[in-house]
């Protein structure tokens, strides 16, 4: 009888998991527990550009967030700064896109996704988003990501995702963006 009750309770609880709840369990970065070990900062200086900036991790109102600031310059064939991680891994099969909770100014900004098939540094899939001064959520469906850098398949294959980056890209501008959460939905 006790075993039946336990099995019934487990069955009821399993049925209570909604698709939204399952999606919430997908890979999610909240920038806690040593985020500097999972995130790297890059500029176009690796290829001769002159953009500059920094990535810091800050706490405000009980939430840790990443803060990327700097200046993007297209001089000397440059034009980007970015923060990148490979810690999210590939999304689960049912994932449909990338979700961010962010704020900032001087957008647009971009999510750059690299896959197991992006071999050259200038190859990635890109989707843009705008920012506001207040914390807000943006959802970027996988089909919004476009191949950049040549020699890539036209559509992003989500299960081949190897890294995710937030990038300030392609135009001269000051950068100020904060990310509180990033993951798949």
Would you name each region that the model predicts?
Residues 8-16:
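Bacterial N-terminal signal peptides
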Residues 19-185:
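Beta-rich carbohydrate-recognition modules and glycan-binding surfaces
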Residues 1-7:
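Bacterial N-terminal signal peptides that target proteins for export
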């Amino acid at each position: 009888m006790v075993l039946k009750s336990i099995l019934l309770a487990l069955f009821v609880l399993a049925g209570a998991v909604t698709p939204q709840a399952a999606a919430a369990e997908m890979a999610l970065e909240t920038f806690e527990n040593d985020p500097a070990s999972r995130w790297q900062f890059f500029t176009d200086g690796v290829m001769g550009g002159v953009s500059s900036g920094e990535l810091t991790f800050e706490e405000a109102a009980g939430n840790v967030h990443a803060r990327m600031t700097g200046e993007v310059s297209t001089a000397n064939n440059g034009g980007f700064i970015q923060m990148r991680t490979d810690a999210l891994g590939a999304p689960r099969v049912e994932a449909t896109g990338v979700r961010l909770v962010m704020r900032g100014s001087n957008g647009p900004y971009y999510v750059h996704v690299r896959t197991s098939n992006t071999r050259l540094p200038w190859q990635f899939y890109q989707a843009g988003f705008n920012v506001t001064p207040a914390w807000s959520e943006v959802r970027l469906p996988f089909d919004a990501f476009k191949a950049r850098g040549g020699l890539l398949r036209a559509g992003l294959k989500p299960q081949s995702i190897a890294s995710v980056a937030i990038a300030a890209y392609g135009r001269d501008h000051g950068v100020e963006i904060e990310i509180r959460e990033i993951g798949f939905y």
